[in-house]
Amino acid sequence: ECADVYKECWYPEKPCCKDRACQCSLGMNCKCKATLGDIF
């Protein structure tokens, strides 16, 4: 199972789909970053 863009993610249980970056704020709330392909 993988996390979609802007959804919560955590490794290794739930990485982001399509190799998106999982960005965490203060090491707690992690969400998948959008890629250029998601924006356009």
Swiss-Prot record:
CDD domains: Spider_toxin. It is found in: Secreted. It holds the Pfam family Toxin_9. Transmembrane segments: none annotated. Keywords: Disulfide bond, Knottin, Neurotoxin, Secreted, Toxin. Disulfide bonds join C2-C17, C9-C22, C16-C32, C24-C30. GO terms for cellular component: extracellular region. Signal peptide: none annotated. This is U2-ctenitoxin-Pr1a.
